[in-house]
Structures are given as structure tokens and as C-alpha cells.
């Protein structure tokens, strides 16, 4: 019998991003309780030795999003590309498909976090109560209508500490961007000038 290979999309990710992602997810599961119902699976609970962690994010329609982080994969294109990666799956019953990070963020946003969305315009005109702000801006990246942008400008921005976990932020490419180096100004008094 021949080997049957299964191909998966794995986003190559920096090791420190995975560490940050896992700690943010655990914080919002156990401390802030905003990720209610999420399940964090440790590497020692998984039968696959390449899996570093697995986060199960359930939805109302009995589907779930599974974000799996991998380690010890074969190295990437460059020497500093250590073998760390992330795969994102959406499951409904026995149906499984791969999802891109932006779609995953939209799914999470629609289900879990309070949002100041397009319906806010209509509700504000009707005099109804409007949610004050969007907690998870990564969930909708498109440009809104003029009325939506005006309402958004009216509401003051509040930063969340720590931020909510974003799959798109986890998978963004940092290796191929040029890094800026800080130019330190010399201390003139120390140099004798």
C-alpha cells in the first residue's frame, strides 16, 4: 500500500509570537474570562510530537475553530527561520477546512467580543442604546461607511491591556521586513565635549 500524504497550510511564525499568542489566550480564558468556552490543549496532551499547543474556539452553530501551533518543523528559507508554524482549521461535524487568519479573526469577532458595528448607525438614529466601542478591531479591517466613520471618531479610543488575541497578528510576516535600528546619541558630557 502506498503512503497517503495530507497537505496542510502552515503559516511560518516566529517562536516569540507563538509564546505571546499562547499567554494572551490563557490570560483571556482564565483571568479576564472574555474567551469563555475556549479550550487550551497543551503539547503533552497531544499525541503528535510536533504540536506545541492547540486552541479550540467553539461557535454557536456547533462549529469550532482550531488554531494549532507547531514546533520542530523543517527549517524555512533562511537560516533564522526556525521550524515554528501555525495552522488554522474550521470544523463542523466531520467537515474540516483550512481558514486564512483574517477569516479566523472575523469569525472570532462575530461571536465573542463586544462590537461597535454597522448596525450602530441605524440604532443611534432610532435613539436606541449603542455599544460604546469595538473590543476586537482585528475582526473587521474594511473601511466603513461615512456615517460609521463619523460615529467612530466621536467615541474616544480606549486601549485594552493586555490586547485580545488576533490570529492575523500571530501569522503576520516579520522576517522579510527591514528592521529599523535605533541610533543612540552619544552622551556629550561623558565624551568630554
UniProtKB/Swiss-Prot annotation:
Residues 152-165 are annotated as: Multimerization. One of its GO terms (cellular component) is virion component. This is Virion infectivity factor. Vif-defective viruses show catastrophic failure in reverse transcription due to APOBEC-induced mutations that initiate a DNA base repair pathway and compromise the structural integrity of the ssDNA. In the absence of Vif, the virion is morphologically abnormal. A motif (HCCH motif) lies at residues 109-140. Signal peptide: none annotated. It comes from Simian immunodeficiency virus (isolate CPZ GAB1) (SIV-cpz). Keywords: Host cell membrane, Host cytoplasm, Host membrane, Host-virus interaction, Membrane, Phosphoprotein, Ubl conjugation, Ubl conjugation pathway, Virion. The BC-like-box motif mediates the interaction with elongin BC complex. Induction: Expressed late during infection in a Rev-dependent manner.
